[in-house]
Amino acid sequence: MQRSLVGSEMCIRDRLYTAVLPASSGGYGVVSNVYAFTALMLVLLTFGMETGFFRFANKSGEDPMKVYANSLLSVGGVSMIFVLLCLLFLQPIANLLDYGNHPEFIAMMAMVVALDSFQCIPFAYLRYKKRPIKFAAIKLLSIIGGIGLNLFFLLLCPWLNVHFPATVSWFYDPDYLVGYIFISNLIISAVQMFFFIPELRGFAYKLDKALLKRMVVYSFPVLILGLVGILNQTVDKMIYPFLFEDRQEGLVQLGIYAATSKIAMVMAMFTQAFRCLLYTSP
């Protein structure tokens, strides 16, 4: 269910982005490039601790709440350090990634990936406690909210700006569509934190170094596998713009490439479904 919901959201968002962002603007290329780095950082900041939490929470002789507290403290601490470093060296990082004119893109997505990384642990806790309704409700509300905000900024605001400019002119910039995509993501990630307030209180936040060390050692292979998997999916979108002397042309071509690759993914899904059906048929 979760995969189908996320897949539906991605399909709707990609269709919206390719329709609203002109190919010549390179906007979809920017979105694809930034989200590729975001996916990589999400794997790094969780460093396999979600799997480690499940392993040790279900292990006899371990206190599940102590395991949960150590998972929250470790992932939360790493995420906070990551955000602070990104904000401290924001302009150099933006220059390195060729977003010197829009360092706020880096700042917003750094906060998004930090929030999403931290929230992986409460989501895992809901699964551990066998609370699928709240898990699915948060996911569903986040998806609906994300789509709604994208529709608001990318479709409704441009229409209002033309027909009733006074209603949106005080905050809306028609040339900042890519920025509104990242703003929408940040809003949803921040609001989602409030749903986890009950899961973030009622127990002692005490770091157990011995337990944490064992959890990190167990989770490290998961981190390596996660990095290999995510790089296989995203490294092309990370390096694509750097293959062109003209940065803008690189983003334009990346947008086209990323959009067409989504079609290939859908074709691969249908092919795989056909093979599974064929091999399981009597």
Locate each region found by the language model.
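Membrane-water interface segments that mark the loop-to-transmembrane alpha-helix transition
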Residues: 8, 33-34, 43-91, 104-107
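Alpha-helical transmembrane segments of polytopic membrane transporters and translocases
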Residues: 27-45, 221, 253-272
